Amino acid sequence: MSQSTATYINVIGAGLAGSEAAYQIAKRGIPVKLYEMRGVKATPQHKTTNFAELVCSNSFRGDSLTNAVGLLKEEMRRLDSIIMRNGEANRVPAGGAMAVDREGYAESVTAELENHPLIEVIRDEITEIPDDAITVIATGPLTSDALAEKIHALNGGDGFYFYDAAAPIIDKSTIDMSKVYLKSRYDKGEAAYLNCPMTKEEFMAFHEALTTAEEAPLNAFEKEKYFEGCMPIEVMAKRGIKTMLYGPMKPVGLEYPDDYTGPRDGEFKTPYAVVQLRQDNAAGSLYNIVGFQTHLKWGEQKRVFQTIPGLENAEFVRYGVMHRNSYMDSPNLLTETFQSRSNPNLFFAGQMTGVEGYVESAASGLVAGINAARLFKREEALIFPQTTAIGSLPHYVTHADSKHFQPMNVNFGIIKELEGPRIRDKKERYEAIASRALADLDTCLASL
């Protein structure tokens, strides 16, 4: 198939991946037609018509370079990521993590793209894969049915999907502050989380209520397949009585403050379990329940979660919801630039490619956008080194075993190993990987 001669590039979908792709293309001097159906047609999970809306958590996760997603974010900053730049401008306290005011952040991304002289925003639903120009499809897990059918056909009709869920958001003014305390785990960074401590008795009662609560139904023909990093809390609880204690309710590093007077198990300095609440907006008036993605019926959410100490009278401004995420057989369908193997004018980006997470989705849009622009200019494709996070992630999702392919977060395990003797100390090893990654990325960019 010959390269398109159109004078613009299409980007379908203005989520994190599409917004990033559109920006990267436009900053290289190429006109973009950015299509977004919200405003004309709603989705079940989105609440606004803003671009890059965060429908699950408001966290971009860890910010340290000894964390793989922290490394990926730093690489994206060096590549002038619109998502990272606007995220930084709308940060809210989150200890050692990066969290944002979800409304302010999405509004700022939207304004920047709508006001860009080379980006034409078109509010319309796309039902066919365009063939008029180089195109980046970044319609996300909530792709409309008509377009999803066309993408599904590229998959050979195989159904790749999983479920993920969002956590509830509550009104801070309705939290009983006498029963909670402010602290970040291990006192890392500023004290940024409200902690709801539980005794063993309280935890056991909560576990019983959670595991017997009624879930919202799935379609009868669909199996319950969940992404491990966004598993509903009730599913986690049913895996074992202590599973949550090693997950979102882990108490380690969240010792009681000296002035705590509430119930505790004997003289223990650490609660048996802790539910953490994270600030969700810049004003600090909304908090989400960390790690409590759920598919319970709304009435059940209120009943069960109001048994958490401090939340007895909590008002929920948004209940948790679950949605079906479809993704592609990327190892067979895409190259490392997220370019279609069968149609070089077609790129994909975001969760549909098999990357999982806000940051990873934006990173895939960055890679796809840069390479769509380079194709437009008839330049050689840019494949980032496998020693970097932004190079290892697309390499993984396009070279994994197709038979067992599952969505993947960025992690140090997919980055090329260090040469020489293995560094035994994990923190030092990750620091060395990060240092090499940033040096290799800088070298790569300097050669362009």
Curated annotation (Swiss-Prot):
Q: Show the Pfam families listed in the entry.
A: GIDA
- Catalytic EC class: transferase
Q: Which GO terms describe its molecular function?
A: flavin adenine dinucleotide binding; tRNA (uracil(54)-C5)-methyltransferase activity, 5,10-methylenetetrahydrofolate-dependent
Cofactors per UniProt?
A: FAD
Q: Which PROSITE patterns match?
A: GIDA_2
Q: Which GO terms describe its biological process?
A: tRNA methylation; tRNA wobble uridine modification
Keywords, A to Z, come to: Cytoplasm, FAD, Flavoprotein, Methyltransferase, NAD, NADP, Transferase, tRNA processing
Which GO CC annotations does the UniProt entry carry?
cytosol
Residues that bind FAD: 13-18
Q: Which reaction does it catalyse?
A: uridine(54) in tRNA + (6R)-5,10-methylene-5,6,7,8-tetrahydrofolate + NADH + H(+) = 5-methyluridine(54) in tRNA + (6S)-5,6,7,8-tetrahydrofolate + NAD(+); uridine(54) in tRNA + (6R)-5,10-methylene-5,6,7,8-tetrahydrofolate + NADPH + H(+) = 5-methyluridine(54) in tRNA + (6S)-5,6,7,8-tetrahydrofolate + NADP(+)
Q: Which Gene3D superfamilies match?
A: FAD/NAD(P)-binding domain
- EC assignment: the record states 2.1.1.74
Q: Does the keyword Ubl conjugation apply?
A: no
Q: Which domain of life is it from?
A: Bacteria
**Principal cellular location given in the protein's record:** cytoplasm
This protein's record includes keyword Secreted: no
Location in the cell: Cytoplasm
List the HAMAP family.
Answer: TrmFO
Q: Which family does it belong to?
A: Belongs to the MnmG family. TrmFO subfamily.
Role this protein plays = Catalyzes the folate-dependent formation of 5-methyl-uridine at position 54 (M-5-U54) in all tRNAs.
**Name the UniProt record assigns to this protein:** Methylenetetrahydrofolate--tRNA-(uracil-5-)-methyltransferase TrmFO
**In which organism is this protein found?**
Streptococcus pyogenes serotype M6 (strain ATCC BAA-946 / MGAS10394)
Gene from which the chain derives: trmFO
